[in-house]
Amino acid sequence: LLLRRMGSSIIAGRNTAQKMLNEWGNDEAMEGILGEEDDDSIESSSMRDITPAERTELELTVAALNDNMSADPKYKIVVEYLMQKKWLELGCIIFSQYYDSAYWLAEELSKNELKSEAIGIYAGNNRSGIMLDGYFQRKERDTLKQMVRSGELRLLIGTDAASEGLNLQRLGTLINLDLPWNPTKLEQRKGRIQRIGQTRETVDVLNLRYRGSVEDRVHQLLSSRLESIRDMFGQIPD
């Protein structure tokens, strides 16, 4: 669980480790932590009491992640592709499995490189909205979709849980901030923009993962599995 959150972003890993320290043993709180997972095998009922040694490890993990929060390499790569490679001009959707990661990325971009650029956050549980100049204003998801279609929004950051059935052919590029362990979900992310009505002949996709991490190995396995699935069935439907 913690490795998966850390594989998404440093902030998601830090927040999860801190919540685990504070809430372990609180079944309701732990179910909230697990709510965004795409792996049904991870269940709160399987969690035993935390040992003193494990608590110490979590405390060290939180401290280490805190020390590195301002230097997340994924952020630098996202900025490079949006700005230097001009993906923002083509329209871009960024997917993350976790709201913590989506909100963090939108806020950092809005405070720094993308000041005065409206950034959409597309999520569930009434957490969708617009980030502008570092400030967040809640908006309905239908409003965000219309803003993308009209060209008012060039950048949308969405979570998997909220994005089923999302059709955004106006956007021409996709960044996977993290990688779901279910290969079908990874393919369906691309399907949000690679649809009838897409004006670009090719859709550019960037998959981000930390080198040497568990996510790096997952990417290798997903690539192999997706290739096998495409060979058998073609593009995966929604």
Each PLM stretch: what is its role?
Residues 152, 184-190, 194-238:
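A conserved SF2-helicase RecA2
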Residues 128-138:
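Short, flexible/disordered intra-domain loops and linkers
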Residues 112-117, 181, 196-201:
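Secondary-structure transition/capping motifs at alpha-helix termini
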Residues 164-179, 188, 203-207:
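A short beta-strand element within the Helicase C-terminal
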Residues 137-138, 142-143, 176-177, 183-190, ...:
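Amphipathic, heptad-repeat alpha-helical coiled-coil/stalk segments that mediate oligomerization
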Residues 156-171, 191-198:
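SF2 helicase motor core recognition
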Residues 1-125, 140, 146-149, 162, ...:
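Helicase motor interdomain insertion/brace
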